[in-house]
Amino acid sequence: MRAWRLDLALAPTDQLPRNPSGNEPVPLKLILAKKAYSSWSLRPWILLAQLKIPFEEVIIPMDQPETRAGMLKYAPTGKCPSLQDGKIAIWESLAIIEYLAEAYPEKTVWPKGKAARAHARSLASEMHAGFVALRQTCPTNFRRPVKAIALSDEVRGDVARIEAAWAHARATFGRGGAFLFGRFSAADAMFAPVVNRLHVYDVSVSTQTRAYMEAIMALPAWKAWIADARAEPWRIERYDAI
């Protein structure tokens, strides 16, 4: 178990401090699967890290005999991610995000403005429930070399919808910054694993889409996650072989 209090102004990213004071309590505990392969774990993790909300991480490797038993200690679904705040347990990425928005209103988890928040929540829910073809064809692998694969019409349809959604959010709400709603928010956290999929599977995208992807991949929190993923000893051959 490791504590995170990220000073995201520091560089290089592999020196981001883990609980540098050594004695301050960290109230939140985020339970994750392998960083190399878990898209759902990244979503709350990058939100917590980028918004500088202190937390501890507990990694329970996937595809191990003890995986489900370990995850059941923290969530009744036996899946990751889940969040512990003292005696309060929260599971599922969107539920964790909404809990953080309520617990840390000063952190602007969702965009400011009623219309922007409604749009951001809609996009986050669409991501949570949709884009099945892309997710099945291009499984998450944060240390995969950049290499193209054949894509079906269904996958290309998912990509087209994602590009349109990002472009509309940027044009309507994102003029104040590099992210979907200007400042980094939960909507960006929900789509962060998609950025990785489009990048490592070398999917052809517009210049505008690529600029947004580069903004996400330039985040210190993103770089810290990728560094951790590459350092993990665990391998899942069925994903690495794609």
Model-identified regions with their sequence ranges:
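Extreme N-terminal basic, low-complexity initiation segments
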Residues: R2-L8
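GST-like domain detector, emphasizing the conserved glutathione-binding G-site
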Residues: L6, Q15-L151
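Short, contiguous strand/loop micro-motifs
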Residues: L30-L32, V58, G182, H199-V200, ...
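Tryptophan-centric aromatic hotspots in well-structured domains and transmembrane helices
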Residues: W40, W91, W110, V159, ...
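Short, solvent-exposed turn/loop segments enriched in Gly/Ser/Thr/Pro and often Arg
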Residues: P61, A186, A229
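GST-like fold's C-terminal all-alpha helical module
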Residues: M127, F131-A218
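Long hydrophobic alpha-helical segments typical of transmembrane helices together
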Residues: T209-I242
